[in-house]
Amino acid sequence: MKFVDEVTIDVTAGNGGAGCASFRREKFIPFGGPDGGNGGHGGNIFVVGDRNLNTLIDFRYIRRYTARNGEAGRGSDQFGAAGEDIVLRVPVGTIITDTETGEKIAELLVHDEKILLAKGGDGGFGNLHYKTSTNRAPRQKTPGWPGEVKNLKLELRVLADVGLLGMPNAGKSTLIAAISNARPKIADYPFTTLHPNLGVVRVGPSQSFVVADIPGLIEGASEGAGLGHRFLRHLQRTRVLLHMIDMAPFDDNVDPVAQAKAIVKELKKYDPALYEKPRWLVLNKLDMVPVEQRAALVKDFVKRMRWKGPVFEISALTREGCQGLIHAIYSHVASLQEQPEEVPDPRFTTNEDLSEAAPAPDRDDPRFR
């Protein structure tokens, strides 16, 4: 299935039905009074988050959604039926924005969360509504109110705990296939990954985290080069980024340090907030480096990179070092999920000794007997 993570749609809620002006007409009842009912409410348009969806492709082919209008009121005190609502199902993690105002209408982060996108118009009043003790035969009625019309932008950002970052062919897809049940396409040419892939990593029976793999970045990605710039937004909800480095490039003229610095530069250009996220270095393909040269190669890389954060040495192909990386990631993610201790509100705290401010009651006082 084709991956689509951004679409624009038009939604039109239903108009309210018109009110009715009529009078009761029966034999032997010359002045039956008003009996015109109100119009029905126009149909609303809702959006619901669905964890079973992972693309917005359905909205690529159907871009206009119009709810039914409410029915008009009728005589004999009959109110019009409300228009049928429309419910749009989108992947969890979708952000919906009004293109005209720029206002963020909804951000669906929970399965089955339901949010109103466009409100249907209220039904008009029939003449029965205007009946009073002084106006017993009203003839006025009102039309229904129009429903809301909006042009909306739907943007999908995947929900993942960990994001994989790196140049093409750094081994990101190989890693996600090694540590999870995800099976992305893997090949020895650049840009094999064309869309984000998600994988669930099981650490224990009830312990897991989600990893997101996006297409590789190249220098100039923030200006539109390559594919990665289109998918960097999918890393904005992650808790930690794994910067994967190819330590054994095919071309001897390629400098892994220069490539790593280029990725960091592009990340900072694209989104400073994404640049500030916790980022770990994962030195991959060490199985292709002679054992006696590994320590010196890693030490030289870290020194030239001037890196102060965590460093992991792995081989995604042979899975060497992957278990240590998995447990480190889970410990980090679990620590962030713990709720912080409640901090008492300083407005309701005092440093005074309450034992002195409120002396103990006198036991001889008859009120306490």
From Swiss-Prot:
Residues 1-159 form the Obg domain. Its EC number is 3.6.5.-. GO terms for cellular component: cytoplasm. The keyword Cell cycle does not apply. This is GTPase Obg. Keywords: Cytoplasm, GTP-binding, Hydrolase, Magnesium, Metal-binding, Nucleotide-binding. The keyword Nucleotide-binding applies. Residues 339-369 are annotated as: Disordered. Pfam families: GTP1_OBG, MMR_HSR1. Mg(2+) binds at residues 173, 193. An essential GTPase which binds GTP, GDP and possibly (p)ppGpp with moderate affinity, with high nucleotide exchange rates and a fairly low GTP hydrolysis rate. Plays a role in control of the cell cycle, stress response, ribosome biogenesis and in those bacteria that undergo differentiation, in morphogenesis control. Its cofactor is Mg(2+). It comes from the Bacteria. It comes from Leptothrix cholodnii (strain ATCC 51168 / LMG 8142 / SP-6).
